[in-house]
């Protein structure tokens, strides 16, 4: 078993162990397109997009971008909170197989089919595995800067993220402090000097409990701001799982649908080994290179949104029968 480092010992004890759950009910936001292909027709896609965030992200991380994607593709976009993130419940385990089962259950609950996945970082691996395991559900995907391989080198980054978040916990910043967000960011600087990373980690920080949200890992009654992640559990539960990949169980699996990979040229996440495995698992892949590090969504927001919209629109156009109106099988006239 992995031993936590000394720095990770917070002044507050872990409240309770997390429950074990095969699937969880995922919180989500639905972004509907405001524009149509023709002003007199209600034309939308019957192929919904599911946007899967990165580690310590949430459905709110790139809500603005998701609205742009909805309008740009004329498609509903579901942004989800993975387990142990945002307003979705806390549970173990936190491995890729389990996260894919959560995606499957989510789609079943909301009657989604022919889904198009957009996954970033952690979400990219979840999306790749979902495509390989659930080809009957997934039509196509955009994978942002990750590869289907084990990546043990990212464990050190994960530990730094957790250290910085625990430092906020130890700072005991009051929920009534009007400057709580800035003070939290300052508290994180010791272990996380990168302001962009801090901003993304802070998306899960709240000064009041979300309505209906319960967790055995968070004490909302202590008067302090709280992360919506069970951060005191995350090193033992998540560090090695996030860097992992189910090599043996995916051996020989291929996804025959179109997949667009957006690669950061300054990022180490898609190595030569990763490139090889991408070609093995996703034979219909295309690459788009961005002059960016791993944080493509922050460094090149307009560019990556355009790539997603262009890719999905082209795929929809290519698959549409010649006699149908692009966008929906039966467009309804507005009255």
Curated annotation (Swiss-Prot):
Record-listed E.C. numbers: 2.3.1.268, 3.1.2.1, 3.1.1.-
Please give an example of a GO cellular component term from this record.
mitochondrion
Question: GO terms for molecular function, please?
Answer: acetyl-CoA hydrolase activity; carboxylic ester hydrolase activity; transferase activity
Main localization, broad class: mitochondrion
State the UniProt keywords alphabetically.
Answer: Hydrolase, Mitochondrion, Transferase
The organism's taxonomic lineage, starting at the top: Eukaryota, Fungi, Dikarya, Ascomycota, Saccharomycotina
Where is the protein situated, by its record's location annotation? Mitochondrion
Q: Which residues form the active site?
A: 121, 145, 294
Annotated ranges, domain AB hydrolase-1 = 48-300
This molecule's function is given as: Alcohol acetyltransferase that catalyzes the synthesis of ethyl acetate from ethanol and acetyl-CoA. Can also function as a thioesterase by hydrolyzing acetyl-CoA in the absence of ethanol, as well as esterase hydrolyzing ethyl acetate.
The UniProt similarity line reads: Belongs to the AB hydrolase superfamily.
Q: Which Pfam families match?
A: Abhydrolase_1
InterPro entries assigned to the protein according to its UniProt record, in alphabetical order: AB_hydrolase_1, AB_hydrolase_fold
Q: What is this protein called?
A: Ethanol acetyltransferase 1
Catalytic reaction annotation = ethanol + acetyl-CoA = ethyl acetate + CoA; acetyl-CoA + H2O = acetate + CoA + H(+); ethyl acetate + H2O = ethanol + acetate + H(+)
